[in-house]
A protein has these predicted regions:
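Zinc-dependent deaminase catalytic domain
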Residues: 3-4, 15-20, 24-184
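Extracellular adhesion/carbohydrate-binding repeat motifs centered on closely spaced tryptophans
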Residues: 1-11
Length: 184
């Protein structure tokens, strides 16, 4: 397949800076000439999780989750924190951890295609609580990437102690840039 030459302009460089691309941008880079500026998969999926979180009625904390195939080619499920399907769109309590809402991870896991027998990655705007971590371990998730660390690290601790790869968004994004996985 023949790729057309990409003209790398100052506008492209500014776009890349706004998107958070931190590596040196040069028209001499063959990947830049061929592809222009592209976000990493970690950034792409975390952006999707952020957008999904906007569907939440939780006024205190909106959380979004996306589950994808490990090769980044398929979205398997999305979820956000909220009430059960016909439930009211209101909190049981404004006290942290007692909203009564179903967690974003649970909503995504309930809808996930379990006939998909390949490694799955989960991107979540906030790290999971311990109860959600237990469900994640039962769901054959190979990697979890979180945006913001939850007030209690028990969920992350449990996942890591059971051998699940857990990365902050910053770690996942840097790893992809280092290995240039996002160019594929």
């Amino acid at each position: 397949e023949q790729m057309t030459e990409h003209s790398f302009t100052a506008d492209d460089q500014e776009f890349c800076r706004r998107c958070g691309v931190s590596r040196h941008l040069s028209e001499d880079d063959p990947d830049i000439r061929r592809l222009g500026c592209r976000p990493t998969w970690a950034k792409s999926w975390m952006d999707v999780a952020q957008i999904v979180s906007l569907r939440s009625y939780d006024r205190r904390l909106r959380v979004g989750t996306v589950i994808v195939s490990a090769d980044n080619t398929q979205v398997l499920s999305v979820g956000y924190n909220g009430n059960f399907r016909v439930g009211p769109h209101q909190h049981e309590s404004l006290e942290p951890g007692k909203s009564g809402f179903i967690h974003a991870e649970v909503n995504a896991l309930v809808k996930c295609n379990y006939g998909f027998h390949k490694p799955k990655h989960m991107y979540i705007t906030h790290s999971p609580c311990k109860d959600c971590a237990k469900l994640i371990l039962n769901a054959d998730i190979a990697r979890l990437v979180y945006g913001v660390k939850y007030r209690d690290s028990a969920g992350i601790d449990l996942l890591e102690s059971c051998g699940l790869e857990v990365l902050s968004f910053e770690e996942a994004d840097a790893l992809e840039r280092q290995t240039k996985l996002y160019l594929n």
